[in-house]
């Protein structure tokens, strides 16, 4: 069950079932082409679509809405504003409000392990809202396309990687900066070696550098690269091509590829690396006397609050 602004189940004749969304706060949901394409838009542009708990819960509800709709064949995940997503929200007014006890606290901070203490609480919360939900979206019973632009940082990578296909504007950059800014070993859904390659992953995490859309395309991570002013229309045209594929064939193609990658060790590696991620949090919790679950400038890290420039991973530059 998702805790979000989604209305009650509407049971119709002949077993048809749909969910009618009420007003979302952090995302937008709409359908295109007589409902054959669903578009989910991350809608915190001023915060560069940093992911609050409320956004993630609403995103899960929107994915579920599209999955339950038999008319929908393809789901596009996109974003408003200058960036696809700057990662997890680490201290905005919305984030503080959602976390803080009181009438405005988000319900997700009162369940799924939130009431437990110590490492267990963080482990259960991150497993449910950061890790397991991303795995769930990867296996959504629809074909999904991430339409990305601008910065795709850290947890923003997770949202793109859980989609079946990624299309990018020419100005897109991809980076996971949690190593150099938070002293963490990567985000919770550690798809990096599978998406970037093993050595490129080490380079990007150890430096905090980024790669552009063209290099991501060369790696096979990105399917299409479009000019920024053509991204929206070109993505819809791409989705229309895919929507023509019979639904059973499309789903079995997706499952065949996902099961092959899983047989190669993908899911097992994700599970193991999530535990390593939690060990990293526990380390910082001990080092900081329980004050923080990540590192700070005191330990030689970059000040993430200052939003330091992310440099491109150019082969000729140290």
Curated annotation (Swiss-Prot):
Disordered: annotated span: 90-110
Keyword match Lipid metabolism: yes
Coiled coil: none
Keyword Repeat attributed: no
InterPro entries: ClpP/crotonase-like_dom_sf, Enoyl-CoA_hydra/iso
Keywords carried by this UniProt record: Fatty acid metabolism, Lipid metabolism, Lyase
One of the protein's GO biological processes: fatty acid beta-oxidation
Gene3D superfamilies in UniProt: 2-enoyl-CoA Hydratase, Chain A, domain 1
Disulfide bonds: none
Stated induction or repression of this protein's expression: Repressed by Mce3R.
Gene Ontology molecular-function annotations: lyase activity
NCBIfam families: PRK08290.1 (NF006140)
Family named by the database record: Belongs to the enoyl-CoA hydratase/isomerase family.
Protein name per Swiss-Prot or TrEMBL: Putative enoyl-CoA hydratase EchA13
Species of the source: Mycobacterium tuberculosis (strain ATCC 25618 / H37Rv)
The organism's taxonomic lineage, starting at the top: Bacteria, Bacillati, Actinomycetota, Actinomycetes, Mycobacteriales
């Amino acid at each position: 069950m998702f805790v979000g602004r989604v209305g009650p189940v509407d049971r119709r004749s002949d077993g048809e079932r749909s969910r009618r969304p009420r007003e979302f706060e952090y995302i937008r949901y709409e359908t295109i082409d007589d409902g054959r394409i669903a578009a989910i838009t991350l809608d915190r542009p001023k915060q560069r679509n940093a992911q609050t708990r409320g956004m993630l819960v609403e995103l899960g509800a929107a994915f579920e809405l599209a999955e339950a709709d038999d008319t929908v064949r393809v789901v596009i995940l996109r974003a408003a504003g200058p960036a696809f997503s700057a990662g997890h929200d680490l201290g905005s007014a919305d984030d503080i409000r959602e976390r803080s006890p009181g009438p405005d606290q988000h319900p997700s901070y009162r369940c799924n392990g939130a009431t437990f203490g110590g490492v267990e609480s963080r482990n259960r919360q991150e497993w449910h809202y950061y890790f397991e939900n991303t795995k769930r979206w990867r296996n959504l019973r629809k074909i999904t396309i991430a339409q990305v632009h601008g910065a795709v940082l850290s947890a923003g990578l997770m949202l793109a990687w859980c989609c079946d296909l990624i299309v990018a504007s020419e100005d897109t950059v991809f980076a996971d900066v949690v190593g150099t800014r938070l002293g963490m070993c990567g985000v919770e859904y550690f798809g990096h070696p599978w998406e970037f390659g093993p050595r490129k992953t080490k380079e990007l995490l150890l430096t905090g550098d980024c790669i552009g859309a063209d290099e991501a395309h060369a790696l096979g991570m990105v399917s299409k690269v479009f000019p920024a002013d053509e991204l929206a229309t070109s993505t819809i045209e791409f989705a229309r091509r895919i929507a023509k594929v019979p639904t059973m064939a499309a789903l079995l193609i997706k499952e065949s590829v996902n099961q092959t990658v899983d047989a190669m060790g993908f899911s097992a590696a994700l599970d193991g690396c999530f535990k390593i991620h939690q060990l990293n949090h526990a380390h910082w919790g001990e080092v900081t006397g329980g004050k923080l679950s990540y590192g700070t400038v005191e330990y030689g890290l970059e000040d993430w609050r200052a939003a330091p420039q992310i440099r491109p991973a150019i082969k000729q530059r140290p």
